[in-house]
Regions:
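Active-site mouth loops of central-metabolism enzymes
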Residues: 2-20, 61-68, 95-103, 120-129, ...
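Catalytic cores of alpha/beta
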Residues: 70-79, 130-140, 186, 190-204
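Hydrophobic faces of well-ordered beta-strands that scaffold small-molecule active sites
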Residues: 1-3, 35-37, 62-66, 84-86, ...
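Surface-exposed amphipathic alpha-helices with a cationic face
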Residues: 28, 52-56, 110-120, 138, ...
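Glycine-rich phosphate-binding active-site loops on the catalytic face of alpha/beta enzymes
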Residues: 85-93, 144-157, 203-222
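Histidine/lysine/aspartate-rich catalytic loop segments that bind and position anionic ligands
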Residues: 122-176
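Conserved N-terminal beta1-alpha1 strand-loop-helix module at the mouth
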Residues: 2-64, 74-81, 136-139, 162-165
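C-terminal helical cap(s) of enzyme catalytic domains, especially alpha/beta-barrels
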Residues: 55, 98, 157-163, 216-238
Length: 241
């Protein structure tokens, strides 16, 4: 469960609440498997103290989303999260808009992740469902890829039937990465409506979902929103090919 938007609500008024740490505890109680938090360069929601406290309390495994910068590398090496997920980042974007271009940055990314891996932190790369990017991720020593599901979700939410072809592309990419020995995750834009399509893909081990869960929690509580999302995932996995 991505808890960024708990911090977004906090930042709207500049208060000390709601506390992402309390959210993490509820995530665990509701059956969540881990916590994802994106420490952006502009600190627009999650801040350094949140990351430190989440790791110190060790409520659930911590996946730190971050840009490929010297500052973020230092923070990861200091905090020692269970995993880092490297994402592209632009200050003007509302949320991450696309996957990391690994194939164009092989040398620099390999150098960037080397000290992180030496600290036994698992490295994930947020990428588009492309064999070219998957090959590049494998070549630099990534442990995990997270497939960007945003385009699929946009089509699905707008009732555009082209989402069916995009799902096929995601499934093909997941199978390809799995055969290469990469662990496969997926995320971005998933809702209770769209999550089933991704959950049916056998090779995808983990889903990172945040905005939809936090949105639903306004009406049904955070625990209830997590439980419903998990149920949707479980139902879809029963019908895997």
């Amino acid at each position: 469960v991505n808890i960024d938007h708990v911090a977004t609500v906090r930042d709207a008024r500049g208060t000390s609440y709601p506390d992402p740490l309390i959210a993490a505890k509820i995530v665990k109680e509701a059956g969540g498997d881990g916590i994802t938090a994106h420490l952006r360069e502009d600190r627009r929601h999650i801040v350094d103290q949140d990351i430190g406290r989440l790791k110190q309390q060790n409520i659930l495994p911590l996946n730190l989303e971050m840009a490929v910068t010297d500052e973020m590398q230092k923070i990861a090496l200091d905090v020692l999260p269970n995993a880092v997920c490297l994402v592209p980042e632009k200050r003007e974007e509302r949320t991450t808009e696309g996957g990391l271009n690994v194939s164009k940055n092989i040398s620099s990314l390999r150098s960037f992740i080397e000290p992180i891996k030496k600290k036994h932190i698992r490295v994930s790369l947020f990428i588009e469902p492309s064999e070219k990017q998957i090959d590049a991720a494998k070549s630099i020593g990534a442990d995990i890829i997270e497939l960007h599901t945003g385009y699929f979700c946009d089509l699905y939410e707008n009732n555009d039937k082209n989402y069916i072809e995009v799902i096929k592309t995601i499934e093909k990419a997941a199978k390809y990465a799995f055969k290469l020995g990469l662990e496969v995750h997926a995320g971005h834009g998933l809702t209770t409506g769209s999550v089933g399509y991704i959950s049916k893909i056998r090779e995808i081990k983990e889903l990172n979902i945040g905005h939809a869960i936090i949105s639903d929690s306004i009406f049904m509580g955070l625990g209830g929103a997590i439980e419903i999302m998990k149920q949707k995932i479980k139902e879809a996995r029963l019908y895997r090919a």
